[in-house]
Amino acid sequence: MTEQIKKLDPDTAIDIAYDIFLEMAPENLDPADILLFNMQFEERGAVEFVETADNWDEEIGVLIDPEEYAEVWIGLLNEKDEMDDVFAKFLISHREEDREYHIVWKE
């Protein structure tokens, strides 16, 4: 019998991703990107809960079950409200007792 996983609600996933982003961004983003993010976030910033992609294995080298993870993007929106400048993509496990996360940072 498979264990039923209680999925993260979007607001919780967004909060987790944003907290981790703020803590780790200085070590993983260029200073110019951090400055851009800080200057533009209030006007154009977004933290979005998106459908979990099934190609994370290409990014992290491990196959994952998209049903067991939430995906959150942090970036800036353009004038069409599309996120065209993604600073980080987060993959966060739904398992509260063993929370894993992976991050793909802007290069």
Curated annotation (Swiss-Prot):
It comes from the Bacteria. Pfam families: DUF440 (PF04269). InterPro entries: dsDNA_mimic_put (IPR007376), Put_dsDNA_mimic_sf (IPR036763). NCBIfam families: PRK05094.1. Belongs to the putative dsDNA mimic protein family. May act as a double-stranded DNA (dsDNA) mimic. Probably regulates the activity of a dsDNA-binding protein. This is Putative double-stranded DNA mimic protein Asuc_1259. It comes from Actinobacillus succinogenes (strain ATCC 55618 / DSM 22257 / CCUG 43843 / 130Z).
